[in-house]
């Protein structure tokens, strides 16, 4: 009889925070008004753990979270957020204002200026930041 592997499953703090963000994002009716006709791929890239996850925002919802990112870097619908895992977790749980993270040099955002404004508005609506 084969032994059952009972090794604890390692969970990612970043992935957990992205699921929290997804739930909060999808439950907020004001966000739905804000993101009308705004379909994007949010790439969360941890600079210290090399973890990458992509959140697909389509049809007024954060629909899925996938490991890695298969979207080409030059795709205009790709929004890349780079920071340490701790900073990303704090940002996606509403504990660290992304605008402050940018000013502090803790966060790098690669997208159009219009998308940066949209992200800031989303943070303000969701967390009142």
Predicted regions and their residues:
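Feature captures hydrophobic
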Residues: 2-129
């Amino acid at each position: 009889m084969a032994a059952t592997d009972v090794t604890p499953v390692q969970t990612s703090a970043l992935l957990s925070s992205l699921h929290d963000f997804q739930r909060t994002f999808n439950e907020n009716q004001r966000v739905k008004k804000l993101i009308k006709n705004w379909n994007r791929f949010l790439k969360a890239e941890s600079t210290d753990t090399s973890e990458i996850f992509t959140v697909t925002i389509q049809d007024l919802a954060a629909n899925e979270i996938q490991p890695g990112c298969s979207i080409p870097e030059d795709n205009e619908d790709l929004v890349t957020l780079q920071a340490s895992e701790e900073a990303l977790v704090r940002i996606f749980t509403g504990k660290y204002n992304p605008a402050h993270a940018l000013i502090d040099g803790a966060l790098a955002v690669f997208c159009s200026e219009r998308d940066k404004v949209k992200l800031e508005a989303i943070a303000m609506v969701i967390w009142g930041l």
